[in-house]
């Protein structure tokens, strides 16, 4: 009887150890999601780089993020009702809003929605990259695409991104303005913006390395080496649609670590 009890106790101990190990393991923090479905949450809070241009963040009475931005001597106050003061992406939202890269939607009553967990289309990414890199309208489009129409809000931005080779078209006839950006696609865009530097960094500690496409492998290696993505965050699934909050964080880190002018020394 005692032997049976001892065996049962040993089995229970092994089972508990396995459960605890799995719950604490980085691969369990984000299951293998269907591409483009949902966004994993970041485990830590983004660091706030003091040397970047930032606004003043306070907590509104409702508990929402309140951001005061000063531009050209005028102050603007944003209250993002869909962001709480403790959300991990608050520093990144501060950065992109203060620097005029992203803003959100005014919903009236002094409130705005940033929609941090929404995806981003390729046209939206082109517009933000255009602002980030200080782009200028090109004299003539490099190529004409069936889904890029003159007069659309994204026209100059898409033509600039296409002409400079930062964002690749989906096909010879379609730029793919309405398609949502994946994580590895955005990393590839930033890699090209930096001049496509070589990187042989190991992705051994990157949980989703086997999921990275061969086309974007060099870009992901570079992003990993530079610290644009980090192993302990468990949110950078290569083929998953990237969120607005994630893009805000990538832009903040790029500016801090590399700078919009190109590759860091």
Predicted feature locations:
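Feature responds to low-complexity, polar/acidic, surface-exposed segments characteristic
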Residues: 6, 18-90, 103-123, 130-155, ...
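Sec-dependent N-terminal signal peptides
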Residues: 6-14
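Positively charged n-region of N-terminal signal peptides that target proteins for export
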Residues: 1-5
């Amino acid at each position: 009887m005692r032997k049976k009890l001892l065996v049962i106790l040993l089995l229970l101990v092994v089972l508990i150890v396995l459960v605890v190990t799995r719950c604490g393991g980085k691969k369990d923090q984000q299951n293998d999601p269907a591409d483009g479905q949902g966004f994993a949450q970041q485990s830590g809070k983004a660091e706030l780089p003091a040397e970047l241009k930032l606004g003043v963040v306070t907590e509104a009475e409702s508990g929402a993020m309140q951001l005061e931005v000063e531009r050209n001597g005028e102050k603007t106050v944003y209250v993002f009702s869909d962001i709480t003061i403790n959300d991990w992406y608050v520093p990144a939202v501060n950065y992109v809003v203060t620097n005029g890269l992203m803003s959100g939607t005014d919903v009236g009553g002094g409130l705005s929605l940033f929609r941090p967990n929404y995806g981003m289309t390729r046209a939206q990414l082109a517009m933000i990259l255009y602002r980030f890199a200080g782009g200028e309208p090109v004299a003539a489009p490099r190529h004409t695409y069936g889904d890029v129409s003159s007069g659309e809000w994204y026209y100059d931005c898409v033509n600039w991104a296409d002409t400079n080779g930062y964002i690749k078209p989906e096909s010879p006839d379609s730029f793919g303005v309405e398609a949502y950006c994946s994580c590895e696609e955005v990393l590839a865009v930033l890699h090209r913006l930096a001049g496509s530097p070589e990187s042989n960094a190991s992705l051994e500690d990157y949980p989703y390395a086997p999921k990275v496409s061969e086309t974007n492998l060099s870009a992901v290696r570079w992003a990993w080496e530079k610290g644009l993505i980090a192993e302990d965050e468990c949110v950078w699934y290569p083929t998953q649609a990237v969120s607005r909050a994630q893009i805000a964080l990538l832009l903040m880190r790029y500016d801090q670590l590399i700078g919009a002018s190109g590759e860091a020394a």
